[in-house]
Amino acid sequence: MASQGTKRSYEQMETDGERQNATEIRASVGKMIDGIGRFYIQMCTELKLSDYEGRLIQNSLTIERMVLSAFDERRNRYLEEHPSAGKDPKKTGGPIYKRVDGKWMRELVLYDKEEIRRIWRQANNGDDATAGLTHMMIWHSNLNDTTYQRTRALVRTGMDPRMCSLMQGSTLPRRSGAAGAAVKGVGTMVMELIRMIKRGINDRNFWRGENGRKTRGAYERMCNILKGKFQTAAQRAMMDQVRESRNPGNAEIEDLIFLARSALILRGSVAHKSCLPACVYGPAVASGYDFEKEGYSLVGIDPFKLLQNSQVYSLIRPNENPAHKSQLVWMACNSAAFEDLRLLSFIRGTKVSPRGKLSTRGVQIASNENMDTMESSTLELRSRYWAIRTRSGGNTNQQRASAGQISVQPAFSVQRNLPFDKSTIMAAFTGNTEGRTSDMRAEIIRMMEGAKPEEVSFRGRGVFELSDEKATNPIVPSFDMSNEGSYFFGDNAEEYDN
């Protein structure tokens, strides 16, 4: 677990590595990227896609989803045992878009899962290459985080829509492993735990018997993952209390909601990784670039450089704005759905707008949408500067018990002030006397009250020119202090559940 002194870098989590040095990590991440790229090239050949069609992000998503479904052991077993009409459990597929006579056509393809698994393993030197699969899951998760606001899911578990900046990774599948756990936000972990506790309340046998033992193990593991994200002793102590509860119930739910609220100021540490669509890695590998030999990192300049030199296209609906579609995908590629918009605008070099101001729906096209009116355009995924990713949460002082970035989960280690209205957040803590009163609660509230809005996070850290690969000359941006840059606030983005 992350906080027990076994800190592994994201890259190690990403590649299931034991402790490796930086060069080995860069090589093993590069190897993973090579595998995804080779697989994508092979799939484009199988599907007879032109170069342009192969760079279409919608085709990339279908191909990624096919391989993820082919390796989803649990769901495959479930489908075998519960056959449903018209679904062949051994096959996987989806929409592939091709350009025919100057028009975009949708073609539904179907493949044996066995065949897809064979192509994937072949592209990955015979391995299952779980790290590559997880990498694609995180890309899908980052895209969902940028596209949808999870208000309804928050309300359902008794949380507040204002906590949406804690929801990174809320659509990641359970099987996403250590790399997946690292990128999940505090709110996501709290929501998973609350759902579990609610099941226990409603189903008397949930914690009992042989199965209940496994369930209990999973519960404690999830508690430990969440505990590892908190950076203050009081928050961690509360997590111990939740984990050790004999019979988790409403008191634990209250504690978890309290902790989630506290994370709006006392930020948890949540990893950020730049995971790009397979249609970016494919052409790069095809052009002869050797990621394993050159080395690759998900948290440094590499993804920025790769995006600078990539051509990716997207289908555009009649009333969508291509520039807005580009922003959506750019944010997803940089795992920046919860980063401060002032900062993103600076890095990107063009204004980044809140979700509600974008005239664009999600990237995926539903099967009932009319293809006759579909156009396509180039996604502008380049940036003006690059910056190092962070997982610190942006807390300001070294005891790590101060104001983090309110309503924002920082993705980049770049200096910024914390423009926030603390009174609004503290109001959430008054008059809520449910749950336990404890020294820990008092201590957490005291730390939050001490948070000063005028403080600066990541002091002295800056962005870098793209030519500055060794990060030698940080450029510290200056921002308009008054204006808080949250992507989802005051907003009406579509819901993921729709």
From Swiss-Prot:
Complexes and interactors: Homomultimerizes to form the nucleocapsid. May bind host exportin-1/XPO1. Binds to viral genomic RNA. Protein-RNA contacts are mediated by a combination of electrostatic interactions between positively charged residues and the phosphate backbone and planar interactions between aromatic side chains and bases.
Protein name: Nucleoprotein
HAMAP family in alphabetical order: INFV_NCAP
Leader sequence residues: none
Single GO MF annotation: structural molecule activity
Family: Belongs to the influenza viruses nucleoprotein family.
PTM entry text: Late in virus-infected cells, may be cleaved from a 56-kDa protein to a 53-kDa protein by a cellular caspase. This cleavage might be a marker for the onset of apoptosis in infected cells or have a specific function in virus host interaction.
Annotated motif Bipartite nuclear localization signal, positions: 198-216
Protein task: Encapsidates the negative strand viral RNA, protecting it from nucleases. The encapsidated genomic RNA is termed the ribonucleoprotein (RNP) and serves as template for transcription and replication. The RNP needs to be localized in the host nucleus to start an infectious cycle, but is too large to diffuse through the nuclear pore complex. NP comprises at least 2 nuclear localization signals that are responsible for the active RNP import into the nucleus through cellular importin alpha/beta pathway.
Domain of life: Viruses
